[in-house]
From Swiss-Prot:
GO terms for biological process: tetrahydrobiopterin biosynthetic process. GO terms for molecular function: 4-alpha-hydroxytetrahydrobiopterin dehydratase activity. This is Putative pterin-4-alpha-carbinolamine dehydratase. The keyword Chaperone does not apply. InterPro entries: PCD_sf, Pterin_deHydtase. It catalyses: (4aS,6R)-4a-hydroxy-L-erythro-5,6,7,8-tetrahydrobiopterin = (6R)-L-erythro-6,7-dihydrobiopterin + H2O. It comes from Halobacterium salinarum (strain ATCC 700922 / JCM 11081 / NRC-1). SUPFAM superfamilies: PCD-like. It is an enzyme of class 4 (lyase). The keyword Lyase applies. Gene3D superfamilies: Transcriptional coactivator/pterin dehydratase (3.30.1360.20). It comes from the Archaea. It holds the Pfam family Pterin_4a.
């Protein structure tokens, strides 16, 4: 289990366009086509499964929201930040 990061560390390390929201970090990606968003969500799912650290993924018509947190640590960890970066790389 990773250690929970404090708010200052999260702010310093949070990738652009991600939001620190309570005990999680979130980002909403916009897509012109619904199926492009579905494909992206599937890629994020594969990435997360490889890391055995599973985000909440919400698919809407033209948006996909990704939310990372570590329930065992009770907040955001270094693994969440790293997976946020790797998720951005998929886009």
């Amino acid at each position: 289990m990773s250690d929970r990061l404090d708010d200052d560390t999260i702010s310093d390390r949070l990738p652009d366009d991600w939001i620190h929201d309570g005990d999680a970090i979130t980002r909403t990606y916009t897509f012109e086509e619904y199926l492009d968003g579905v494909a992206f969500a599937s890629e994020v799912g594969d990435l997360a499964d490889e890391a055995f650290h599973h985000p909440e993924i919400t698919i809407r018509y033209d948006e996909v929201e990704v939310r990372f947190t570590d329930h065992e640590a009770g907040g955001v960890t270094s693994q969440d930040i790293e997976l946020a970066r790797r998720t951005d790389d998929r886009r």
